[in-house]
Each structure stands twice: as structure tokens, then as C-alpha cells.
UniProtKB/Swiss-Prot annotation:
Keywords: Acetylation, Antioxidant, Cytoplasm, Disulfide bond, Isopeptide bond, Oxidoreductase, Peroxidase, Phosphoprotein, Redox-active center, Ubl conjugation. It comes from Cricetulus griseus (Chinese hamster). Its main location: cytoplasm. There is a cross-link at K7, K120 (Glycyl lysine isopeptide (Lys-Gly) (interchain with G-Cter in SUMO2)). One of its GO terms (molecular function) is thioredoxin peroxidase activity. The gene is PRDX1. Residues 6-165 form the Thioredoxin domain. This is Peroxiredoxin-1.
Amino acid sequence: MSSGNAKIGYPAPNFKATAVMPDGQFRDICLSEYRGKYVVFFFYPLDFTFVCPTEIIAFSDRAEEFKKLNCQVIGASVDSHFCHLAWINTPKKQGGLGPMNIPLVSDPKRTIAQDYGVLKADEGISFRGLFIIDDKGILRQITINDLPVGRSVDEILRLVQAFQFTDKHGEVCPAGWKPGSDTIKPDVQKSKEYFSKQK
């Protein structure tokens, strides 16, 4: 795994790359064009594999939930945009993706994967890296899974909601926090309000 330039609390590495857009067209996109929105940027190893379609379809199927949070989901792999399109055009029952509601970025030179520290150099593919970037372009969360285990869309939604809550209210979110749950005031005395309610 490469060390990369992605660091929590710092601007996420910008990129410009060709993506297959939800309308099936090719378009060059930049991370910077999403400034003002949260971004969930995730890498997956390869098109036409086994765990990858389950993750990508899960994110695509719930793209509207992210959109309601002013959050754009973007997927990326080292495959060409032509390969992405072929996979999208392959029926789900044959291991394909079917129509997508999120852009899929092509990183054939592996520069984006390297920049984000997810390149598995010995195989020339990406680990399952996921990055939550806030509306100011600051990297707020990083997870990197080894190849055989997929990610939870529910957990990513929860994290976006939690970061947005802390941005807006200045309170912090305890373990397992969900919208509507109690939060903690980050103050020695005021935090006792939360802890006094615990069993």
C-alpha cells in the first residue's frame, strides 16, 4: 500500500479524470467541482469481479439518500472508462452493474489511487479505500479494507450525518450515534449532561 497524500484534517488530493456519468456519457470531472458538497469517494479493486458489484450497486441504489444530505458519491478503480461502461451495460444477473446513479472514475495510470494511499502496487489495483470529504474539501474520514470484505452503506451514511451534525452544532457524536440520538457537549462540565443519562 502506498503512503499517499490523503491526510485527515487537510484538503483532499484533487484529481481530474474521465468518469462514466449516470447518463452513460463520458465526462472529465474534478474533485474541486464538488466543493460546497460533501463527497464520499470510494475505490474498489476491479470491474467484473465479485464483491465490487455488491458495493457499487448498494451505493448507487442509495445515491438519493446521500443527495438529500448534499453529498455526492463517486466510485473509482484502475479500469478504463470503456471497461466501466461495458460493466454498466452488462445485466446484473450476469455480474454486471446495470444503470448507475453515481459517477465511476477511471484511474488507469493509478495516480489517484497512489495519491490517496490505496494502491496495492504488487497487483496494480486499489484496496477498498473510502474517503469522506466535507463541503470545504477537507478530508474527514478514511477507511481502507483488504480486498475480500465489502463496506456498509448504512455506516457511511451515518458518518456523513454525524460529521454534518458536528459541523452545524459543535457538539460531538458518541459511538453508534444516529440522527436524533443524544450528543455530547465538548466541555468537562457540560459533557456530564450526556454521561449522567447513561446506564
